Amino acid sequence: MTSCRYRARLASLVLAFVTMLMWSPLHAQTSGVTGAVGISSELVDRGLAVSPPTPIVQGALSWTSPSGWSLGASAATEIRSPGKVSEALVQVSKYWSLSNEWQMRGSVLYYDYPGNARAKYFDRSEASVDWIYRDILTFGLSGICLTNGDEHQPRGAADVNFHWPLAWHFSVSAGVGVAQSLLSPYGPNGYGHASVYRYGQLGVIWSYGPWRMELDRVAADPGSHRQWGNLVASPWVGTISWSF
């Protein structure tokens, strides 16, 4: 119970701090604030479902400075349970230009699922480094530390994502990744090593002005099906969003 109260206070403080920075008059002349709202058929995180297959309302705000800093916060809730926050995320990032075509991004993220008992094992903090080629190809490495329960052995993940624009406002996206599972087997000598699983997605995107629609085919290897059971994502996930 103490851990839950601590995480709730920490999430509230970080969210308040990010919101203050976003809207502070000090940055009004030099920063850009953007946001988005949308509806998804399911919340999926690295190939695993962190919500039931039910409509999810999501909202996000981000602030970006000319020097490459970015602060963001987002939240999601099930339409059938609007009073419960299914997912909350806070992110701080810094971009560096490596050349005319390459960028590097370092990020620190905090995930919390306060009203989502199904995803309690996904509460975590992450540090990641990404290399980005012309907004087409992204390669990322992540270090993960769980913030819930008694098992805090560090995990790792690696992801490659691809995005290619097509005609008539369409584009295709694809991604593959490998990660250590967030649950480790428990034996007589304590927690063992986290197993490794693979995941991926292939999708089509239509965007026009502030509107965006996306349909993804999501997959994970059979090992994750045996280990996670009802946390296996639906094969198809759809999202429609509006940005401002």
Where in this protein do the model-derived segments appear?
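Short glycine/proline- and aromatic-enriched beta-strand/turn motifs that initiate or cap beta-hairpins
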Residues: 28-79
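Residue-level signature of outer-membrane beta-barrel architecture
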Residues: 41, 63-65, 94-96, 102, ...
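Outer-membrane beta-barrel "beta-signal"
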Residues: 202-211, 230-244
